[in-house]
Amino acid sequence: VVSCADILTLAAR
């Protein structure tokens, strides 16, 4: 699954 932290890291790119 995708965690909130993973989404934030991807969005930060």
Swiss-Prot record:
Required cofactor(s): heme b; Ca(2+)
Q: Which GO terms describe its cellular component?
A: extracellular region
Q: What is the name of the protein in this document?
A: Peroxidase 8
Q: Which reaction does it catalyse?
A: 2 a phenolic donor + H2O2 = 2 a phenolic radical donor + 2 H2O
GO MF term set: lactoperoxidase activity; metal ion binding
In which family does this protein belong, per the annotation? Belongs to the peroxidase family. Classical plant (class III) peroxidase subfamily.
Ordered alphabetically, the record's keywords are: Calcium, Heme, Hydrogen peroxide, Iron, Metal-binding, Oxidoreductase, Peroxidase, Secreted
Source organism per entry reads Capsicum annuum (Capsicum pepper)
Q: Where in the cell is it found?
A: Secreted
Question: What does the entry's cofactor note say about binding and number?
Answer: Binds 1 heme b (iron(II)-protoporphyrin IX) group per subunit.
The free-text function statement in the UniProt record for this protein reads: Removal of H(2)O(2), oxidation of toxic reductants, biosynthesis and degradation of lignin, suberization, auxin catabolism, response to environmental stresses such as wounding, pathogen attack and oxidative stress. These functions might be dependent on each isozyme/isoform in each plant tissue.
Example GO biological process term? hydrogen peroxide catabolic process
Per the UniProt entry, the Enzyme Commission number(s) are 1.11.1.7
